[in-house]
Amino acid sequence: MNKEELFDVTVIGGGPAGLYSAFYSGLREMKTKIIEFQPHLGGKIHVYPEKMIWDIGGLPPITGAKLIEQLVEQGLTFQPEVVLNEKVESITRDEYGTFLLTTSSGQQHFSKTVIIATGSGILKPQKLAIEGAERFEVSNLNYTVKSLKHFKDKTVIVSGGGNSAIDWANELEPLAKKVYVTYRKEALSGHEAQITQLLNSSVTCLLNTSITKLIAGENHEAIERVELTNHETGEISYLSIDEVIINHGYERDMTLLENSELNIEMIDNYFIAGNANSESSIPGLYAAGDILKHDGKLHLIAGAFHDAGNAVNKAKQFIQPDASEYGMVSSHNDVFKKRNRELMKQMIE
C-alpha cells in the first residue's frame, strides 16, 4: 500500500458508531475508509441478533440482526472502502501530520484524520475454565444466543449473573422446557427490572453455585449433565441438560491504544477522554460510541450516532477549515435526489 492512497478519514471499527461515521463522512464528500477486525460489519450487536432494541429514536422495536442490516446498508451508501479481518495495532503520525495506521498483518493505511469507533474494544467471550470444555463448542456449549428457536423445548442452564445472562434467561423462559441460572455470587447483578422479571418467572436460580464439570453422553460429542458446586456448603449436585450457555463477560483487547505512539488522553486506562464534539487530546483524531467518555455522554446506540456526526464535522473542518460547521440535512441534499425519486415511485406504485 503506497502513500498515494491517502484518505480524508479512516474509521476504526464497523459497529453503529463506525457505520454512521462512514455514512455521514460520505454525505460531507470525504474519502472514507472503514477498518474492522471481524469478518463482518455490525459490531457488538452480532452478540444479540434476536434481541429487541427499543431505544433508537424514530424506530419501532427492531431485532439486532435487522438493525445490523439497516446500519450496514446506510453506512455503505457512499461506497467507503471497507477492510475486514484486519486489526489496527498502532497509530503514528509523520512529520507532515498524516496518520499512519498499522495492522497486525503489516498493512499500512494513511489518513488525514482518524475516528476511533471500537466500542468496548475487540471482544472475546471469557471461556468456561474447565479442561476439555472447548470440544463441546461444536455441539451444545454456547457463548452467545444466535437463534432462540434452537433452544425451544430444551432444558437450558445459563451460567452468569450479569445483564446479558439474565436477558438470555428471560428471553428463553417462554420457549425452553426449563431454564436454570447458576451464578457464583450470592446475588444477581443485572438491571433491577430484569432481575424482578427473572425471579417472578419459572426460571430456577442457583446462587453461590458454579459449573465445575461437563459430563458427556455415550457418544462423547455433547454435554449430557453438568456438575454443580455450591461455594457456601461445598455440596456437589448434578443436572441433566440439553444446552449450556456461558456468559462470564468479555476479554477486551486494547492493543490499539496501548501501542499508540500518540499521547492520547485516557480515562480509567480504557476510555478515550474527549468532549461533546468527539474531539480527543490529539488534533485530527476523534472518538465515537462507547470508547468515548465525557460529561454528558449518552451510552446508547442513539448516542453513538450523535458522536459520529460530531466527529465527522470536526474532521471535515480539520481538513478544510473554511468548511461549513455542519453537513446539509438529507432532505435538502442533492446527493439524495435520485434515490428519493426512486423511493417515492415505489411508495405510490
Swiss-Prot record:
Q: So what family is this one in?
A: Belongs to the ferredoxin--NADP reductase type 2 family.
InterPro entries from the entry?
A: FAD/NAD-bd_sf (IPR036188), FAD/NAD-binding_dom (IPR023753), Fd--NADP_Rdtase_type_2 (IPR022890), Ferredoxin-NADP_redctase_2 (IPR050097)
Organism phylogeny: Bacteria, Bacillati, Bacillota, Bacilli, Bacillales
Known EC number: 1.18.1.2
Source organism of the structure: Bacillus cytotoxicus (strain DSM 22905 / CIP 110041 / 391-98 / NVH 391-98)
Q: Which domain of life is it from?
A: Bacteria
Task: Tell me how the cofactor is bound.
Answer: Binds 1 FAD per subunit.
MF terms per GO, please? ferredoxin-NADP+ reductase activity; flavin adenine dinucleotide binding; NADP binding
Which cofactor names does the annotation list?
A: FAD
Q: Per UniProt, which keywords does this protein have? A: FAD, Flavoprotein, NADP, Oxidoreductase
Entries under HAMAP family matching the protein: FENR2
Q: What is this protein called?
A: Ferredoxin--NADP reductase 1
Summarize where FAD binds, as residue positions. 36, 44, 48, 88, 123, 290, 331
Question: What Pfam families is this protein classified in?
Answer: Pyr_redox_2 (PF07992)
Q: Which reaction does it catalyse?
A: 2 reduced [2Fe-2S]-[ferredoxin] + NADP(+) + H(+) = 2 oxidized [2Fe-2S]-[ferredoxin] + NADPH
Q: How does it assemble?
A: Homodimer.
Gene3D superfamilies documented for this protein: FAD/NAD(P)-binding domain
